[in-house]
Amino acid sequence: IVSNSNGYEDFSTESLKLIAKSKNRNLMIMQKLTELDNENVPTIVFACSVQHAQILSSMLTLQGTKNVCVFGSMSSTERNEAIRRFKNREDDCNIIINYEVLTTGFDSTNIKCVFITRPTQSIVLYSQMLGRGLRGPQMGGNEKCLLIDIKDNLQKFNENMAFSHFNNYWGGK
C-alpha cells in the first residue's frame, strides 16, 4: 500500500487508482464541484491518478460544467493552454483538475478553493497542495481560501501540524 518512488513514503500508485474508482466518493466529489461552479468559485482539484482526473473532467463536461484537466503526459502546449483558460477564467472556467502537475511552481491568484481528493502520507506534498490556495495577501494570494479535503488526509495529520506552516502568512496562532 505504501511506496517510496517520489522520495517520500506515500500511497502506492495502485492504491490511489483503487481509491479513485469509488463510485460513491466520485459522486460526492462531483456534487461539491458542481456547487462550487454554480457559486463561481475558482477551484483547483488534486486527483488520485491521471485516469481519475480525466474521469472527473469528463463527468463535469457531460453535465455542462466548464473545466480543464492537466497531467504530466500532456504536451506542454496543451497544458499551458488549459492553465491559461483557468487563470483567465475563459468561458467561465472555474475548475482546474490535475494529477501531480500543479503541486509546485504553479501560481494562480484567483484560486478560492483547494479540493484535495487524493490521500497522502506526506506532509510536504500536503503542504504543497494547500499552498496553491493558501498564499495569503502578503504572498500575493487571497485573504480567504476554502479547503475541501476528502476525509483521507486530516486523519493522518492533526490540524495544527497541517496548517502551522501558513500561520506566518495568515497571522494565525
What feature does the model see in each segment?
Residues I1-A47:
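Conserved interdomain linker/interface between the two RecA-like ATPase lobes of SF2 helicase motors
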Residues T43-F46, C69, C113-I116:
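Short catalytic-loop micro-motif centered on adjacent basic/acidic residues
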Residues I44, A53-I55, T65-L102:
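Conserved helicase ATPase core of P-loop NTP-dependent helicases/translocases
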Residues M59, A82-R85, N110, L125-R132, ...:
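Alpha-helical scaffold elements adjacent to nucleotide-binding pockets in ATP/GTP-utilizing enzyme cores
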Residues L36-P42, Q63-K66, T109-K112:
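Short, surface-exposed connector motifs at secondary-structure boundaries
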Residues H52-M59, T104, L125:
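Phosphate- and divalent-cation-binding pockets in alpha/beta enzyme and binding domains
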Residues N94-T120, L125-R132, K144-I150:
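A short beta-strand element within the Helicase C-terminal
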Residues I1, S127, R135-K173:
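A conserved SF2-helicase RecA2
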